Amino acid sequence: MPQLNPSPWFIILLFSWVIFMVILPNKVMNHLFNNEPALKSTEKSKPDPWNWPWL
């Protein structure tokens, strides 16, 4: 039975895991953290008063 011969299947399994563990995490991580969050200022900003034109 040829499917029990581990020679071709083991190398396919090995190369697929190499792709999953080496190449794909780098590509995925490049898309996750492309925007660095900006730090908020500790000073509170004074909000502008609302304009109520109907009163």
UniProtKB/Swiss-Prot annotation:
- Tell me if Transmembrane is a UniProt keyword of this record: yes
Instruction: Describe its membrane topology.
Output: Single-pass membrane protein
Disulphide bond pairs: none
Keyword entries, A-Z: ATP synthesis, CF(0), Hydrogen ion transport, Ion transport, Membrane, Mitochondrion, Transmembrane, Transmembrane helix, Transport
Q: Where in the cell is it found?
A: Mitochondrion membrane
Ranges that cross the membrane: 4-24
Asked if the record carries the keyword Electron transport, the reply is no
GO MF annotation terms: proton transmembrane transporter activity
Q: Per the similarity annotation, which family is this?
A: Belongs to the ATPase protein 8 family.
Quaternary data: Component of the ATP synthase complex composed at least of ATP5F1A/subunit alpha, ATP5F1B/subunit beta, ATP5MC1/subunit c (homooctomer), MT-ATP6/subunit a, MT-ATP8/subunit 8, ATP5ME/subunit e, ATP5MF/subunit f, ATP5MG/subunit g, ATP5MK/subunit k, ATP5MJ/subunit j, ATP5F1C/subunit gamma, ATP5F1D/subunit delta, ATP5F1E/subunit epsilon, ATP5PF/subunit F6, ATP5PB/subunit b, ATP5PD/subunit d, ATP5PO/subunit OSCP.
Record protein name field: ATP synthase F(0) complex subunit 8
User: Which gene is this protein's source?
Assistant: MT-ATP8
